[in-house]
Amino acid sequence: KIRRMYVNNGGDISFWLNYGSAFTIGVVDNPQRPELNTKVCLPYESPVRGLATSGWRGRSQSLGIADAVTVLAPSSACADAAATLIANNVNIEHPGIIRKPACDVKDDSDLGMHPVTVKVPFLHEKEVSQALQNGAESAKALIRKNKIQSAYLSMQKQTLVIENT
């Protein structure tokens, strides 16, 4: 009898659970320094069946400055789109943030000339907090529309968790 199944497509994860089963995930904020930053256990009763992470340090390009935004949603497609949107909105204006046209960073980028983040300096706590709050507003809007269940936002050792309560 199969208790659970999952498919991991480079961090976008879809899963199925049988009655009485659970799926535990670990979240890593910085892929350059992989360490387990938090864990989440998703029981069968949870509406979550997909998760995804996005951020400027990841394999995909980002318009924002989040180290990582992990989203739990009813499907991995919803989680992927939401994580990208929220991570793009974890942002502030700062002269030390370096952005380049996406096509200059990756030849095959579908973002063309859109500026993507390539370097984020150490920011003051208030600046990090403001950037995270900007992303949190996007997460709250998606929760209100029942598109996602929760979002974990991380930047320079600060985290914010937004949940559907």
Where do the language-model regions lie?
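Mature catalytic core of soluble alpha/beta enzymes
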Residues: 1-165
